[in-house]
């Protein structure tokens, strides 16, 4: 909702968002949910951010690539085939969070794995000619600050989501892909 409100503040007209994904899902779980939801509408804007739980659970990069590609095709269909209305967001790095530290996770290894998954989603976004927004660098910088994390010390807070929403809104305005 933060993103749509920011875009509305920039005189862009958007309907209220439909959010399908839930925190904690893998690509496979998101595919199942999309199919179960039976969404057939066309949306002005579609964003896709998924994969951190594939990495966290140790799922294969090959599986991620196949499932992410399927989800990206679905996102493009949800945008009525308008690839310029689809944005992939990179996976944030949870390895810098209090949760990771408290659970003895090696931040360097987590970062390397997150980067590998992000290489996949970036390549898929480029191949399918959709927008790509890197939020990983910001998550590494800001994820150490308690205010940027929910009380569990792992998930993003409203403040972190606001940072991401601002980045996305600025990118959308810069591209000029939406009418004012």
Residue ranges with predicted function:
Residues 9, 36-40, 77-81, 126-127, ...:
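Secondary-structure boundary motif
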Residues 18-21, 90, 134-137:
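Residue-level recognition of beta-strand->loop/alpha-helix junctions
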Residues 1-73, 80:
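Conserved SGNH/GDSL esterase-like catalytic core that processes O-acyl groups on lipids
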Residues 49, 89-90:
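Alpha/beta-hydrolase-fold catalytic nucleophile elbow
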Residues 93-180:
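Catalytic His-Asp segment of secreted/periplasmic serine-dependent ester chemistry enzymes
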Residues 30-33, 56-59, 77, 99, ...:
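A generic "cationic amphipathic patch" detector
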Residues 7-10, 74-86, 120-133:
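A structural motif corresponding to the C-terminal end of an alpha-helix
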């Amino acid at each position: 909702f933060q993103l749509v409100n920011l875009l509305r503040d920039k005189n862009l007209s958007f309907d209220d968002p439909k959010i399908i994904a839930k925190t904690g899902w893998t690509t496979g779980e998101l595919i199942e949910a999309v199919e179960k939801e039976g969404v057939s509408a066309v949306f002005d804007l579609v964003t896709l951010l998924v994969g951190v739980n594939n990495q966290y659970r140790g799922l294969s990069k090959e599986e991620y690539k196949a499932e992410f590609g399927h989800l990206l095709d679905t996102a493009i269909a949800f945008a009525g085939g308008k690839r310029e209305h689809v944005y992939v967001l990179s996976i944030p790095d949870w390895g810098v969070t209090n949760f990771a530290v408290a659970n003895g996770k090696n931040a360097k290894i987590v970062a390397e794995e997150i980067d590998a998954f992000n290489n996949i989603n970036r390549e898929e976004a480029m191949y399918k000619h959709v927008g790509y927004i890197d939020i990983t660098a910001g998550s590494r910088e800001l994820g150490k600050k308690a205010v940027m994390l929910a009380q569990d010390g792992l998930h993003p807070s409203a403040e972190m989501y606001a940072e991401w929403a601002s980045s996305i809104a600025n990118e959308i305005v810069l591209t000029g892909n939406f009418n004012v």
